C-alpha cells in the first residue's frame, strides 16, 4: 500500500523503488521480460537494505538473480540471492511452469498457493541489510543487479563495474533499471501494491515497438 511503502524521506529514513528487467541471452529478442523484479530499497539511520518483489518470468532457462552492493568504491556484497542457489522459477514463482505474466493479452497468470493473483510479496529470501557505519568508505551506496544463466554466465543490468557483461555486440543492454516512473500497480481488493511501476513489453514484443523513444536513446 502507498501509505506503507512510499518513496521519499522522513527524518533519517528513506525508501526508493525500482523495476529491473532482464534479457537472458547474449542474442536476445529485446522484450526485456525474461526476468522482471520490483525492488524496494530502504535506509534507516546507518542501515541500508533491500527486498525483491518478483513480477514476471519470460525465460525458459534456469535464471538466478544476483546483486553487487557498493559503498563508494568499496564492494560490500556480491552474490546470488536464492538459498541453495535456487533458480528464479523455484524461488520466486513456486516452480510454476511456462511464461509467467508476460502474455500478449497482458492477463496475469501467476499462481500463488494455487490462486491466480498479480500480487506477490517482498520475499524474505531476497532481503539483505548492512550497517553502513561499519564501512570506512564515505561514498554513496549503489546496487548493481545481474542474472546468472547458461551455467555461470553473468549478465548485468547496466553495471559500471562489469561493462563487458552489460551490453551485447550491438551495444544494447542486457538489463534495464527503471526509477521513479510515477506510475503504480493496483490489485483488486488490495489497492496500490506497487509504486514506480513499469509496464514491461509482452512476450516476443521488442521494447522498440512499445517504447520507441527509449529504444532510440539506448
Where in the sequence are the language-model features?
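Extracellular distal adhesion/interaction modules in secreted or cell-surface proteins
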Residues: 1-218
